[in-house]
Amino acid sequence: MNRIKEISFSDAVAIVEPGVFTADLKSAVRAQKLFYPPDPASMKDCTIGGNVATNAGGPRCLKYGVTRNYVIGLEVVLANGEVLRTGGRVHKNKTGFDLIGLFVGSEGMLGVVTEISAAFASASTGARDVVGCVCDSGESCRSGASNFCGGVLALFTRNR
């Protein structure tokens, strides 16, 4: 149960078994300018199945979200032996109950995950640096905050 069954670069989806190491999946899609954002600290040692069981995140979760945000389909064996397939290859599936959200993070209490359909994000083209010169650090902070948080900042400073 540690195979990458399929990677479709055209629709940015992979079908994997739960024993696939997170680092292996990341490196398999890196060449196609895609990436799997959840990055637990134990990425080289943890598996996608473990990530699904615990809804793993990592430092990038603040920007990209956690495992739940990238699982679009599951095959789960329930306690009575019944096999449940939920979700699919569609990135945005909002019909019926969110069974994927129910299973991701349940730590195996609801069933055993045997197959995972994972979505990828587009890899960024790189970081950009910004250099500026300011005379008043307070003014530069206010200017930066208004550029990034414009309307929200106005709500907090309206009555000043």
Regions found by a protein language model. Give the residues of each.
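FAD-binding subdomain of flavoenzyme oxidoreductases
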Residues: 3-157
